[in-house]
């Protein structure tokens, strides 16, 4: 049996752009994708902390070091510039793989620069 587990997460990123006229996706700074173990074209779930919206799309690699977090296409209607979002990828793991699995959680600052990378989330903690 396989279980769906968190693979990687970019926690509390700031939306820098929303482009309704671009073909759908989310453009993310390649440095952030690498740090979270998320690949270009990978399916991701996104949570908007400002309005509670949850949706799925796929990633496009943005310029390294740019801090870009741009929602494109229809997803641009679900965010506004400066909204705080969480970007998550998931992996399918067999029961024996689960015990050794550690998701990558990338904590960013207000400019989407990496503050820290952790493999766990302390309960009831604001990061």
Curated annotation (Swiss-Prot):
PTM per UniProt?
Is synthesized initially as an inactive proenzyme, which is activated by self-cleavage at a specific serine bond to produce a beta-subunit with a hydroxyl group at its C-terminus and an alpha-subunit with a pyruvoyl group at its N-terminus.
Enzymatic reactions: L-aspartate + H(+) = beta-alanine + CO2
GO molecular function terms listed in the Swiss-Prot or TrEMBL record:
aspartate 1-decarboxylase activity
Q: Name one Pfam family in it.
A: Asp_decarbox
Q: Which SUPFAM superfamilies match?
A: ADC-like
Q: Name one GO biological process term.
A: alanine biosynthetic process
User: Which keywords belong to this entry?
Assistant: Autocatalytic cleavage, Cytoplasm, Decarboxylase, Lyase, Pantothenate biosynthesis, Pyruvate, Schiff base, Zymogen
User: Which cofactor names does the annotation list?
Assistant: pyruvate
Top-rank lineage group of the source organism:
Bacteria
Primary localization: cytoplasm
What does the record's cofactor remark say about binding? Binds 1 pyruvoyl group covalently per subunit.
Its annotated function is as follows: Catalyzes the pyruvoyl-dependent decarboxylation of aspartate to produce beta-alanine.
Q: What is this protein called?
A: Aspartate 1-decarboxylase
UniProt organism field: Neisseria meningitidis serogroup A / serotype 4A (strain DSM 15465 / Z2491)
């Amino acid at each position: 049996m396989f279980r769906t587990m968190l693979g990687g997460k970019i926690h509390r990123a700031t939306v820098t752009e929303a482009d309704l006229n671009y073909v759908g996706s989310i453009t993310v700074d390649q440095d952030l994708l690498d740090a979270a173990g998320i690949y270009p074209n990978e399916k991701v779930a996104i949570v908007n902390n400002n309005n509670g919206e949850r949706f799925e799309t796929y990633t496009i690699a943005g310029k390294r070091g740019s801090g870009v977090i741009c929602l494109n296409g229809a997803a641009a209607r679900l965010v506004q510039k400066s909204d705080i979002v969480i970007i998550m990828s998931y992996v399918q793991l067999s029961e024996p793989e689960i015990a050794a699995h550690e998701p990558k959680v990338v904590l960013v600052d207000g400019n989407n620069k990496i503050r820290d990378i952790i493999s766990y989330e302390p309960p009831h903690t604001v990061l």
